[in-house]
């Protein structure tokens, strides 16, 4: 990780100082023009700490679940998680998905059956259109779970404010949570805090690339 790359990015620029969450205060080094500025050293330490845990997960051949339900992050999380063959949710989160693994497994099996039906010539055009609609709906909601056979070891959440339900489910199951947190976020429930400008796609890309470099 080269410091110059971080300095040249906007990764260290936090939100307005009046919105500072006390739990994130230890990651702030000073303010400029009323903006909180993250300590680059602490960003690096936080990222490397999570990278060490991710290495352990890969070594044990366990899974990491990516969450990117917020429009701002959706495309990035979708493409990145697929590129490293990890499960993801980039649309609506179905409550209980973590606590009831059998439900999404059933939906993935249903998706496979529907795709087989679409290939059969014996079905009418109307029936095939109906199958295609069902296929699309299931794919959007459950397609990202395809690579998830059991409870993930880590969940990386792009926006904890949008996905509070997932945070609560993960805590009940004692699943580790990592998240990209700005200076206004509450980090009290997060195991691996990634302090950064989470309003910047570039910041998230930089961190993800560092975390998974030489692992995939």
Swiss-Prot record:
Entry's Gene Ontology molecular function annotations: structural constituent of ribosome
Gene symbol of the encoding locus: rpsB
Domain of life: Bacteria
Keywords noted in UniProt: Ribonucleoprotein, Ribosomal protein
InterPro entries in the record: Ribosomal_uS2 (IPR001865), Ribosomal_uS2_bac/mit/plastid (IPR005706), Ribosomal_uS2_flav_dom_sf (IPR023591)
Name the record gives this protein: Small ribosomal subunit protein uS2
Family: Belongs to the universal ribosomal protein uS2 family.
Pfam families: Ribosomal_S2
Organism lineage string: Bacteria, Pseudomonadati, Pseudomonadota, Gammaproteobacteria, Oceanospirillales
Gene Ontology CC entries for this record: small ribosomal subunit
Alphabetized HAMAP family for the sequence: Ribosomal_uS2_B (MF_00291_B)
One BP term from GO: translation
PANTHER family, A to Z: 30S RIBOSOMAL PROTEIN S2 PROKARYOTIC AND ORGANELLAR (PTHR12534), SMALL RIBOSOMAL SUBUNIT PROTEIN US2M (PTHR12534:SF0)
Organism the protein comes from: Carsonella ruddii (strain PV)
């Amino acid at each position: 990780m080269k410091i110059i790359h971080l300095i040249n990015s906007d990764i260290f620029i936090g939100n307005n100082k009046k919105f500072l969450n006390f739990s994130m205060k230890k990651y702030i080094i000073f303010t400029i023009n009323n903006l909180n500025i993250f300590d680059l050293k602490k960003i690096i330490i936080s990222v490397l700490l999570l990278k060490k845990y991710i290495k352990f997960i890969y070594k044990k051949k366990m899974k990491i679940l990516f969450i990117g339900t917020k429009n701002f992050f959706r495309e990035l999380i979708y493409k990145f998680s697929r590129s490293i063959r990890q499960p993801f949710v980039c649309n609506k989160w179905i409550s209980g998905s973590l606590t009831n693994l059998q439900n999404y497994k059933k939906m993935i099996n249903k998706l496979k059956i529907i795709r087989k039906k679409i290939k059969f010539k014996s079905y009418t055009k109307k029936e095939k259109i109906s199958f295609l609609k069902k296929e699309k709906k299931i794919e959007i909601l459950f397609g990202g779970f395809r690579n998830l056979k059991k409870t993930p070891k880590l969940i990386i959440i792009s926006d904890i404010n949008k996905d509070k339900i997932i945070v609560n489910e993960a805590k009940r199951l004692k699943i580790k949570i990592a998240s990209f947190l700005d200076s206004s976020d509450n980090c009290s429930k997060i195991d691996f805090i990634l302090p950064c400008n989470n309003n910047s796609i570039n910041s998230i890309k930089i961190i993800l690339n560092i975390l998974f470099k030489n692992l995939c």
